[in-house]
Amino acid sequence: MMRPLATAALLTAIGIASASAQNAPGERPGTDWATFNGNLMAQKYSTAGQITPENVGRLRKAWEVHTGDVSDGSGDVPVTYFEATPIFANDTVYVGTPFYRIFAITPDTGRVKWVFDPHAKLKALTQPGMKSRGVAYWQAADPQPGQPCQKRVYIGTMDARLIAVDADTGKLCSDFGKAGVLDVNQWNDVHDKWPFSLLQPPTVYKDTLVLGWAGKDWALKKAPVGLVFGLDARTGALKWTFNPLPPKARATSGTADVWASMSVDPERGIVYLPVSSPSPNFYGGNRKEPIPHGTSVTAIDAQTGKTIWTHQLVHHDVWDYDTNSAPSLVDIHKDGKTIPALVQSTKMGYLFILNRLTGEPIYPEREVPVPQSHAQGEQTSPTQPEVQRPVPLVPDRWPGVSTIADIASFGWCSRKAHELRYEGRYTPPSVQGTLVYPATPGGVEWGGGAVDPVSQTYVVNNSYTAQIYRLIPRAEYERETRDKTPKSWHPMKGSPYGVEVKNFTNWLGMPCWKPPYGSLTAVDLTTGRILWKQPFGEVQKWGFYMPDSWGSITIGAPIITRTGLIFIGASMDSRVRAIDERTGKVLWRGRVDAPAVATPATYMYKGKQYVVFVAGGNHLLLPKVSDQVIAFSLP
């Protein structure tokens, strides 16, 4: 049941949370999209309301741009992952490409105002392909008339460069770093081989850029430490550093980095970090000392970087269950009280709903016994946190072998499942091979969810995936990789094992597990109850369309508008959708060039609402890739 619109104070709060950008004159507060997640609180919510459930079926293409920055990986340039969320600020749509170029686009026509090209080396380095999830925007609180770079756009690169350009002209800001470029690798203690890859734009709070990074945490035991940096937005000077690893743990481990987006409580100056797992990802015999920040959501002071609280979501993570998206911040109205809360989605399918001031659970959470490892030197945690409410988005037990996939593989799926170790969620990696469900691409991916602060509804898409994790004894790993390393093998140097991580699919690529493969769910935050849950997306593969009830593997995230509309790409079928927040009913579909795995954006400009998608594709969904930026509006 939808709740009535709250007071104007709530809308004011939403406007405050939308960062330093200003709405155009006459526009309602909260109708820009000035940050990666729509506002600093990572709500992915807009007060724009011109498009409604009644008229959304009339949406038409308003404009599109093709950046030209695309590769299918067949040549010298690695495959591209165009996963950027467009931002709208300064009366301009800005989007960053996988080649680290920035496009400034006129909001109503799609005319390109300017393009910044850093002439970057097109090498994947730490990732399977070329990635950028977009740009960040900052503007001076007291701009100096006639001076350049009073408004700035930032983009990071795979080789650890953070670049600042003038938001009006696209020219480098000479006072930032060295001639507009900051070398973040200067703080990397093992930087020669393992650069800090800046896939996610920095989080901008007042005059501070909060910056995390991604690396090869599966490659070696002592990977770089997962430092988070607080930087001066004007100069790039280091203000503070957050270190997730205790000193003893650093002697034998690394990472626990923050490679995903972050959220900020703008009134309290608190930054919320989704912290990933320590290295190496799939073996923890080298890190028996407690690492409280590993696979956690952690609150830090935006001015100092000091820890306020941490809530660990997985103990001694050996599944690569990184906390992988910004928690959504929302004030929950429950039992006559207003609770400052956050919602943290996870790869395990749990939704952790916490008091964002203390880190304490709002709904029941308990420690439950889990299977133990038999690997050499390993000492897994005897228990893991289990969320009681909301119910997990992904069931605790895997659904069993798909009859169709099994028949198509002449029984291989069922024979393989019988060979693997599986004792439920948190079955650890093993030498014999472990069936992991949900696996690391499952549950909720890096897009996270969206929250409607008025109706108190949280909406999130999730996937159901199974993988095989097999530990490979060091001697065997070295022998078998002497000439060439198989694509699914990872070294974990310094540990007794390498690891093989592969999808549990048959020779046709068909999932060996029963559907569904993807869902979209709405949760009532005041009760923790599921309002509705629907299969999401369609799959056209192996020569036919799968039933709607199967859904699709999903990457990306929804957004919500004031009129109760959910806009989302995220599925395998190269379609974008508008969905009724109250019922889950699809009200509109649009065709795009490739799976739109980036979170969309919406904004008001000159009295008209636009919804913008990046349709770039992703190899997990379809081999098709694209460079399309496309906007829809009413006629």
Language-model regions, residue ranges each:
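Positively charged n-region of N-terminal signal peptides that target proteins for export
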Residues: 1-4, 449
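Extracytoplasmic/lumenal domain signature
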Residues: 57-70, 102-125, 139-144, 162-193, ...
